[in-house]
UniProtKB/Swiss-Prot annotation:
It is a multi-pass membrane protein. It comes from Papio anubis. GO terms for molecular function: sugar transmembrane transporter activity. The keyword NADP does not apply. One of its GO terms (cellular component) is endomembrane system. The chain crosses the membrane at residues 3-23, 42-62, 68-88, 96-116, 126-146, 160-180, 186-206. It comes from the Eukaryota. Residues 10-94, 127-212 form the MtN3/slv domain. Keywords: Cell membrane, Golgi apparatus, Membrane, Repeat, Sugar transport, Transmembrane, Transmembrane helix, Transport. This is Sugar transporter SWEET1.
Length: 221
């Protein structure tokens, strides 16, 4: 029991540390927006989809009584809100950003209404909410595949972040172990694609190293 308790504590701690580290990756974009007073080279949709993902898992954690999920996703949602507000402040096309935000939050509210009004059984609600969160998380991990195809076409990994890739694989692996230990398939399955896509990125970094890209740029200039 003591060994199992220590292992559980280690996994829980890894989930918190690695996930918060991954969410904090947006701080570099926040610093860039403040310094340049623009949103050049900053993508908005990752902030928005991560916000919705955090709110979904926060609801799941609250319904299940999982303190780890509650803490991690509360901090994550707060950080994503900060990034979204900063982007909105510096973005010249605020109408498009507001429309995207309202649309996705509207979908989230409709989901909440469905789960809490039309699914009265708490256990059934928990299962359906877990399924919804899993599908959304998997779609988040698979959405950058278009960028990976672009890397292969251009033979350049400049659009990829190596630190974020490390954070993603560590976070995904931690949550897979967390889901396995607690026997929660929604958490385990939804994070497995994060491991797969991260290793694809590692292969691309090995295949098309960024140092090579910089040397090529210097030769051209």
């Amino acid at each position: 029991m003591e060994a199992g308790g220590f292992l559980d504590s280690l996994i829980y701690g890894a989930c918190v540390v690695f996930t918060l580290g991954m969410f904090s990756a947006g701080l570099s974009d926040l610093r860039h927006m403040r310094m340049t007073r623009s949103v050049d080279n900053v993508q908005f949709l990752p902030f928005l989809t991560t916000e919705v993902n955090n709110l979904g898992w926060l609801s799941y954690g609250a319904l299940k009584g999982d303190r780890i999920l509650i803490v991690v996703n509360t901090v994550g949602a707060a950080l994503q809100t900060l990034y979204i507000l900063a982007y909105l402040h510096y973005c010249p096309r605020k109408r498009v950003v507001l429309l995207q935000t309202a649309t996705l939050l509207g979908v989230l509210l409709l989901g909440y209404g469905y789960f809490w009004l039309l699914v009265p059984n708490p256990e059934a609600r928990l299962q359906l909410l877990g399924l919804f969160c899993s599908v959304f998380t998997i779609s988040m991990y698979l959405s950058p595949l278009a960028d990976l195809a672009k890397v292969i076409q251009t033979k350049s990994t400049q659009c990829l972040s190596y630190p974020l890739t490390i954070a993603t694989v560590l976070t995904s692996a931690s949550w897979c172990l967390y889901g396995f230990r607690l026997r929660v398939p929604y958490i385990m399955v939804s994070n497995f694609p994060g491991i797969v896509t991260s290793f694809i990125r590692f292969w691309l970094f090995w295949k098309y190293p960024q140092e090579q890209d910089r040397n090529y740029w210097f030769l051209q200039t």
